[in-house]
Amino acid sequence: MEIKILERKDNLVEIELINEDHSLPNLLKDILLTKEGVKMASYSIDHPLLHPETGRYISNPKITIITEEGTDPLEVLKEGLRDIIKMCDTLLDELKEKK
């Protein structure tokens, strides 16, 4: 997965996820909204049309995070991604126990 930082300020970061769909940004947004110090977390795909040959969106998802003063939006983003990894690890462990 490729990521591009579009804008970076003390309390704001906007990133673009290259060749991704709604799956990760939607989950990440929901997790970020539960984090202390996060004022706003959202994502958008500017143009929802799919490319006929690749099946990918013509536009890439953009995630925007705005935090309260003293909260680094990139650190909150990393924390949210680690939370997703933990969720997946927990699910994998539960599936192993079901064998």
Curated annotation (Swiss-Prot):
Catalysed reaction, written as an equation: RNA(n) + a ribonucleoside 5'-triphosphate = RNA(n+1) + diphosphate
Gene: rpo11
A Pfam cross-reference name: RNA_pol_L_2
Stated name of the protein: DNA-directed RNA polymerase subunit Rpo11
GO MF assignments: DNA binding; DNA-directed RNA polymerase activity; protein dimerization activity
Enzyme class: transferase
The organism's place on the tree of life at top rank: Archaea
Gene3D superfamilies for the chain: RNA polymerase, RBP11-like subunit
Family designation: Belongs to the archaeal Rpo11/eukaryotic RPB11/RPC19 RNA polymerase subunit family.
Subcellular location: Cytoplasm
Function: DNA-dependent RNA polymerase (RNAP) catalyzes the transcription of DNA into RNA using the four ribonucleoside triphosphates as substrates.
GO cellular component: cytoplasm; DNA-directed RNA polymerase complex
Listed EC numbers: 2.7.7.6
Protein's GO biological process: DNA-templated transcription
NCBIfam families reported for this sequence: PRK01146.1-2
Subunit structure: Part of the RNA polymerase complex. Forms an Rpo3-Rpo10-Rpo11-Rpo12 complex upon coexpression.
Keywords: Cytoplasm, DNA-directed RNA polymerase, Nucleotidyltransferase, Transcription, Transferase
InterPro entries membership: RBP11-like, RBP11-like_dimer, RNA_pol_Rpb11_13-16kDa_CS, Rpo11-like
Annotated organism of origin: Methanocaldococcus jannaschii (strain ATCC 43067 / DSM 2661 / JAL-1 / JCM 10045 / NBRC 100440) (Methanococcus jannaschii)
